[in-house]
């Protein structure tokens, strides 16, 4: 919510900076659960650190969640403090061609959202049948992140 309110970010700059540092830390290894009677419930909406999981090459396990989280960090100005998020962003930008379209190797299907946090965020186009249709969502999100970071974009 703070990421969407620039005036509040400026007024509470110290708090926003501390929050950015907190959200850039790796998430705890131990699962967080809430005890409700005899049942244990794992909440989907609680962020206890950076939820992005990436392999050695920088590919995220949950691409929509990674893009959503990178966008939030970019809006808050906290992306530089999150090493996993910057590694994933660098990997995604490396998969872009010379005109800026995200074209990874072997894209056979739309990347699946594994976390319920991103249901409202991804995909923009549900019926992507062609390879170009599958690339649109990620390309748009990368362009939005680049714009939030203040990078110049050229329309081709």
Which residues make up each language-model segment?
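Short, solvent-exposed beta-strand-terminating loops
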Residues: 92-113
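An alpha-helical repeat/solenoid feature that recognizes helix-turn-helix modules
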Residues: 1-85, 106-154
């Amino acid at each position: 919510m703070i990421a969407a309110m620039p005036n509040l970010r400026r007024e509470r700059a110290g708090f926003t900076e501390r929050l950015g540092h907190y959200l850039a830390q790796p998430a705890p290894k131990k699962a967080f659960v809430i005890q409700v009677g005899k049942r244990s419930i794992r909440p989907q909406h609680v962020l206890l650190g950076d939820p992005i999981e990436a392999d050695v090459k920088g590919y995220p396990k949950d691409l929509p969640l990674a893009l959503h989280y990178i966008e939030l960090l970019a809006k808050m100005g906290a992306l530089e403090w999150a090493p996993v998020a910057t590694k994933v962003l660098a990997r995604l930008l490396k998969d872009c061609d010379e005109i800026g379209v995200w074209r990874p190797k072997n894209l056979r299907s739309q990347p699946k959202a594994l976390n319920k946090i991103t249901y409202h965020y991804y995909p923009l186009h549900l019926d992507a049948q062609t390879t170009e249709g599958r690339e649109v969502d990620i390309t748009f999100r990368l362009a939005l992140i680049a714009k939030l970071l203040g990078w110049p974009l050229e329309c081709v």
